[in-house]
Amino acid sequence: MLPSRLPGTPVLTHGDASPDQVLYERSSGRIWLTDFDRVRLAPAATDLGSYLAADPTSPGHALLEGYAEHRPVPAAEQLGVAVARSRLARLADPLRHADPSWHERIGVELAAIESIARSPEKETAWA
């Protein structure tokens, strides 16, 4: 069972962090974030979990290693819970986007979320 709240000090979060919300300007090296409609105060694991959940096939090593250069990375269990909560928030996306296989995709996603909820610390082991 997922906890109702993530532990941790609330910080300003994007609320829907994912690779498509980040723009990179090659000429200057600047990074821009977009789409702030879900900005809120929440533990840092919220945005990390959201970003990791956006591409579950990617282990997220580069993101977490870069993050660790500037801030302590939340515990693996916290990240796993954040990933599961983010995937749960996006659960209806296939239906909303009229995907013909929405029923199957939601079923697969629910199974993945249940697996993460049983062992959240295994979801983001990166060290």
Predicted regions and their residues:
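An alpha-helical support segment within catalytic cores of ATP-dependent transferases
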Residues: 1-14, 113, 117-125
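Short basic/glycine-enriched coil/helix segment immediately N-terminal to the Walker B
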Residues: 5-6, 24-28
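Active-site Asp-x-Gly
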Residues: 11-12, 26-62
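Hydrophobic HxD+1 residue recognition
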Residues: 17
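Hydrophobic residue at the +6 position relative to the catalytic HRD Asp in the kinase catalytic loop
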Residues: 20-22
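Regulatory N- and C-terminal appendages and interdomain linkers associated
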Residues: 31, 74-75, 94-127
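Active-site activation/catalytic loop segments of kinase-like enzymes and analogous catalytic loops
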Residues: 45-72, 84-102, 112
